[in-house]
């Protein structure tokens, strides 16, 4: 019996070694295939091969050294700075620090920026972190998400693309736990140190959601104005960006003045701020069109006030989904607590884990989908078009084998 067990272990070890060899051979074949496909794109004769492509700025010296070592003086390398005519076809590769880089997934899901655009990922990372955490707020859920992704990154040999997703959700797990601390929720149980009570402070959470939405919209409008200034379209910078920022701030001040009589002067300032900039949109449109034909587009632009109201209303989902997840978790705990003591600590534990597993999955799914929706529509809709083409360098296939420089 001992001999048979030892023999089985030897066979398994041998099979595992053969599997590793097969994986290496598969990567080798994939590399040969990729190399052959690249050769077909070359301009070549019997004695000459010409290759044109893009390379990252910091890799130019490595390329020169590699070609010199491999071919010596038999190769001619010409490096050209990007011309203005190439702006529409230059490929894009995002570059951010380790904390921001995982959120490139959100930007890439929508569209890469064009060469002349700024990478929105740093700003996206802040808002998405807040959105996801607020919609799935629970200390237990956040710790599980953080711990599970950390374990996977430490112990599993995953592809770089999957590792990036795991780092993305690990950071989001921190946001979920932090909002869980604010709401005082731990697997649906109410903790005594909650800063905001999800049962009694619903209006407070609603106001926070709208304020977060207001800041998001303001940021989008500011980036819109900044983008148009960079493109030297000053009329669009005012009409589509800065003017609406001032109008919405004015309306917010006006609302505060109406709600709180002591702030009547603030309301008066807000009313004038909104009115002056609404008139400013009309005047700038007429002046830029050099005729009264600019009046029509100006009035249509002012009609967009309804879309901004809709944007702010859309952010109430931050409250709705957060409260829904907390309420469902509490309901599951109540169901398990109604079991007799024996059942509570047997089948009740299994039921507790299963129900909270479902609620956690749905909370994360909702946070992922609705967080992306708020970014794509309410934020990107103000300033970002995308349309960039991804940079795809010639490199070895890494399906199973990882290469280190």
Predicted features and spans:
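Conserved, carboxylate-rich catalytic/transport cores that coordinate ions
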Residues: 61-405
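Coiled-coil termination/hinge junctions
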Residues: 8-63
């Amino acid at each position: 019996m001992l001999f048979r067990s030892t023999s089985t272990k030897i066979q398994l070890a041998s099979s595992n070694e053969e599997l590793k060899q097969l994986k290496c051979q598969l990567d080798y074949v994939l590399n040969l295939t990729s190399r052959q496909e690249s050769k077909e794109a070359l301009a070549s004769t019997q004695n000459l091969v010409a290759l044109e492509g893009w390379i990252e700025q910091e890799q130019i010296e490595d390329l020169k050294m590699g070609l010199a070592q491999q071919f010596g003086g038999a190769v001619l390398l010409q490096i050209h700075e990007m011309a203005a005519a190439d702006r529409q076809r230059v490929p894009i590769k995002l570059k951010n620090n380790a904390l921001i880089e995982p959120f490139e997934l959100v930007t890439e899901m929508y569209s890469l920026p064009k060469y002349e655009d700024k990478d929105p990922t740093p700003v996206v990372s802040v808002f998405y972190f807040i959105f996801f955490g607020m919609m799935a707020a629970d200390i237990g859920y956040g710790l599980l998400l953080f711990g599970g992704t950390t374990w996977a990154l430490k112990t599993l040999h995953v592809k770089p693309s999957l590792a990036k997703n795991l780092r993305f959700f690990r950071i989001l797990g921190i946001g979920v736990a932090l909002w869980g601390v604010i709401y005082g929720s731990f697997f649906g149980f109410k903790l005594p140190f909650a800063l905001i009570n999800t049962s009694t402070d619903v209006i407070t959470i609603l106001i926070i959601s709208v304020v977060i939405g207001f800041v998001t919209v303001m940021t989008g409008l500011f980036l819109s104005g900044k983008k148009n200034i960079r493109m030297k379209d000053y009329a669009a910078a005012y009409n589509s960006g800065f003017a609406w920022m001032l109008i919405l701030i004015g309306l917010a001040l006006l609302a505060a003045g109406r709600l709180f009589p002591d702030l009547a002067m603030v309301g008066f300032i807000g009313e004038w701020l909104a009115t002056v900039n609404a008139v400013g949109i009309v005047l700038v449109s007429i002046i830029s069109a050099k005729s009264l034909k600019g009046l029509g587009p100006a009035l249509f632009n002012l009609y967009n006030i309804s879309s901004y109201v809709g944007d702010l209303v859309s952010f109430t989902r931050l409250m709705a989904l957060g409260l829904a997840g907390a309420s469902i978790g509490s309901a599951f705990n109540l169901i398990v607590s109604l079991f007799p003591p024996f059942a509570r600590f047997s089948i009740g534990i299994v039921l507790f884990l299963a129900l909270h597993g479902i609620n956690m999955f749905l909370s994360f799914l909702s946070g992922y989908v609705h967080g992306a929706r708020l970014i794509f529509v309410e934020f990107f809709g103000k300033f970002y078009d995308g349309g960039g083409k991804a940079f795809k360098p010639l490199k070895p296939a890494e399906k199973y084998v990882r290469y280190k420089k």
